[in-house]
Amino acid sequence: MKIAIITDGSVEMGMGHVYRTLSLANELRKFNVNEIIFFTKSDEDVIKKIEENGFKVIKCSDNNDILKNIKNIKPDVVIIDDLGIEEDFAKNIRELCKKLIFFDNPNPSSNKYADIVVNAIVGSELKNRKYFDEENKTLYFYGPKYLILRNEFYKVKKEMLSRSKNKETKNILIAFGGSDPSNLTCKVLEELLSKDRDFNINVVLGPKFQYEDELNNLLKRYSKSDKIKIYKNIDNMAELMKDNDLIITSPGMTMFEALFLGIPVVVLYQNELQRECYDDYLKKISKTHLNPLKEGYFIDAEHTDLHIGKGKFEIIEAITNIYNCKKIGEDSKIIIRQITDNDLELLMAWRSNPLIYKFFYIQKEPLKWEEHYSWWMSRENRVDWIILLRENNTIRKVGSVNVSQLNTDNPEIGILIGEFFLWGKHIGRHSVSLVLKWLKNIGYKKAHARILENNIRSIKLFESLGFKKTKKGRENEWIYEVNL
């Protein structure tokens, strides 16, 4: 699979789009994507940063130059990370690839040409939701659940799970981005230094920070300046963050990264645009009485409903899966697409059918909506598909298939056919075979299923696809495995 990524950035305007696409590209590289090429109109700083990560970069003068180069390399997938994708450009790119994906594009006139639109922050109102636009056949991901974080944050989070937290705030990190135009760094630092308490303070300065003289004068005025460390050009922000009890920043990626690690934050606005984007949500979840500063919002990481970064594998699947359709008859096809919010009521009805949940290990009664929705929102390292049966000119939803434990080398597959009058029609077998093709394509070598010993229909399904009973699972359960 060949993927083209179009992105721009600069030290002056920010590197957020570049860093996000690099994080995404590094994730995709793990999943058997054999060629990733970047296209940018940006300067040498951006090109150097991309090349440092081991990716080829083609410098383009304008959008017409990008189109010419895209036409030459013939990518399977094109990913564009840009706040303002023009309709004509989207239409022209659409004709040059099999799959088109947009990040951070709120423009509906161009989004209609995309297969996938991911707006984790822009236009999301910080609400996690996913829906499928039937008219334009576009899958939309909204909310912080679909942020692609750098791999270092996933590694550090694992380390932090086994550590006990300080009961009081001792170590504070201040980080206000590349330029900090409002000089919040000095304002916050002075307020902290003026307090009676002694904090260990780590200050991260961006490459365009313009107030170093003021910062140096500030440090000279306070005897506690020996408790302050200044950092520039940080390569691993997660490592620096993990040893802090509080992070003071502006709304944006640093805020989400801190909350992902479970570190509380104080959020201060640089400008009115940030206030407009974030104020309604931050007002709801902030705890002003815990804020050590006069302004801003205190956000306790343990009391947010953001599910930051948990949708990573849903994004990976949406980009890499080209095995979502299988012809099973003269006029019929099995199609799988990711489950969206619009499918949840039907999925709950299926999961609440005693003919189905009697083969679940834990569930013993019909679900309540709160239980079902909580399960849906908290899923991690997992992808769920709705199974669609297309016959003649009609399409109907008939079941679901999922794969979990994608963060291991042996993911688990589950299947249910919700319309029981279709049992025995091999719809489940065809659907699982599509999932197995996708897993093999992105580099997995094996997969498994957990099956209750009295679920004869499911046992036959998985055995027909080459699964073998390998070991005992939980009570009355066996594990079946297959090599891909």
Swiss-Prot record:
Sequence ranges assigned to domain N-acetyltransferase in this UniProt record: 334-484
GO molecular function: acyltransferase activity, transferring groups other than amino-acyl groups; hexosyltransferase activity
NCBIfam families: PseG (TIGR03590)
PROSITE patterns: GNAT
Annotated PANTHER family: GNAT-FAMILY ACETYLTRANSFERASE (PTHR43415:SF3), SPERMIDINE N(1)-ACETYLTRANSFERASE (PTHR43415)
InterPro entries: Acyl_CoA_acyltransferase, Glyco_trans_28_C, GNAT_dom, PseG
CDD domains: GT28_MurG
Name the record gives this protein: Uncharacterized protein MJ1062
Pfam families: Acetyltransf_3, Glyco_tran_28_C
Superkingdom: Archaea
Classification of source organism: Archaea, Methanobacteriati, Methanobacteriota, Methanomada group, Methanococci
Native source species: Methanocaldococcus jannaschii (strain ATCC 43067 / DSM 2661 / JAL-1 / JCM 10045 / NBRC 100440) (Methanococcus jannaschii)
